[in-house]
């Protein structure tokens, strides 16, 4: 692993969190690391909180490929954090015992109306801003696949497949499989209107395109991981697996499937 010694702590700046993070900073300093207040100077970014804090940390720091991300949970271990705040010394023990590895997690690249793209680590969701059936023309690469009618769609990465995607009965996907999963939210299926009616996987080299069918009021709400984006006039949405990857510090004996087993079985 390349030398990294500038560490930045990402957390919610409340009094209780500042008190909780201070011992972490002291421990990092005692291990020879430089604690920096400017994230641009960091090559290690530690999120303190939970899965949501980790998603915020990657988004707010623009999914930096030159940094190593570490998740520390304040409650219990999550899918992204491998360490808890009360046992942070175990992280440094793992370093010493070489019981760590760097995982590269895929991100989604989302382009709306050919504007500058944004990225998601878990998923991108598209939903109607009004309580009525939402219509999307669905294209796989250049092929028109279906006309979707329903509440919306979720497009997830493999690591994001255990989140919002799973709540709508999407499949849990091994992160070693470069892919994006497309899942329906309350699709309309009857004798007149049909959709595939199930989630489907696209290989990592394909592009999903969603065209919003407008009737004057159907402007979608775009969800990027745990944030809602205010993009009022989105009409053409392209989603693909990005070349941008997030490098995350993980324990060797705490794999994705260990976490699936603990959380769901």
Curated annotation (Swiss-Prot):
Q: Which GO terms describe its biological process?
A: NAD metabolic process; NADP biosynthetic process
Q: Which residues bind NAD(+)?
A: 122-123, 149, 151, 162-167, 186, 226
Q: What is the annotated localization of this protein?
A: Cytoplasm
The Gene Ontology terms for molecular function here are: ATP binding; metal ion binding; NAD binding; NAD+ kinase activity
Give GO cellular component annotations, separated by semicolons. Answer: cytoplasm
Active site (record annotation): 51
Q: Pfam families from the xrefs?
A: NAD_kinase_C
Supply the InterPro entries for this chain.
ATP-NAD_kinase_N, ATP-NAD_kinase_PpnK-typ_C, NAD/diacylglycerol_kinase_sf, NADK
Query: Where does it mainly reside?
Result: cytoplasm
- What PANTHER family does this protein's entry cite? NAD KINASE (PTHR20275), NAD KINASE 2 (PTHR20275:SF9)
Protein's name according to its UniProt entry: NAD kinase 2
Organism name? Halalkalibacterium halodurans (strain ATCC BAA-125 / DSM 18197 / FERM 7344 / JCM 9153 / C-125)
Its gene?
nadK2
């Amino acid at each position: 692993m390349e030398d990294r010694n500038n560490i930045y702590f990402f957390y919610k700046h409340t009094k209780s969190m500042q008190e909780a993070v201070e011992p972490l900073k002291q421990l990092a300093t005692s291990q020879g690391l430089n604690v920096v207040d400017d994230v641009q100077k960091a090559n290690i970014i530690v999120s303190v909180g939970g899965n949501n804090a980790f998603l915020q940390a990657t988004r707010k720091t623009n999914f930096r490929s030159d940094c190593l991300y570490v998740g520390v949970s304040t409650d219990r271990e999550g899918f992204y954090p491998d360490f808890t705040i009360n046992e942070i010394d175990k992280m440094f023990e793992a370093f010493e015992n070489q019981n760590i590895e760097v995982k590269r997690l895929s991100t989604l690249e989302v382009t709306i109306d050919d504007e500058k793209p944004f990225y998601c680590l878990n998923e991108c969701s598209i939903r109607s801003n009004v309580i009525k059936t939402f219509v999307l023309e669905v294209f796989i690469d250049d092929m028109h696949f279906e006309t979707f009618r329903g509440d919306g769609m979720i497009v997830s990465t493999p690591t994001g497949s255990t989140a919002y995607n799973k709540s709508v009965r999407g499949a849990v996907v091994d992160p070693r499989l470069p892919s994006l999963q497309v899942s329906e939210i309350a699709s309309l299926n009857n004798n007149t209107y049909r959709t595939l009616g199930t989630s489907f996987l696209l290989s990592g080299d394909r592009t999903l395109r969603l065209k919003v069918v407008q009737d004057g009021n159907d402007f979608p709400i775009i969800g990027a991981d745990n944030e809602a984006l205010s993009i009022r006039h989105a009409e053409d949405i392209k989603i693909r697996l990005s070349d941008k990857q997030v490098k995350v510090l993980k324990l060797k004996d705490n794999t994705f499937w260990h976490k699936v087993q603990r959380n769901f079985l």
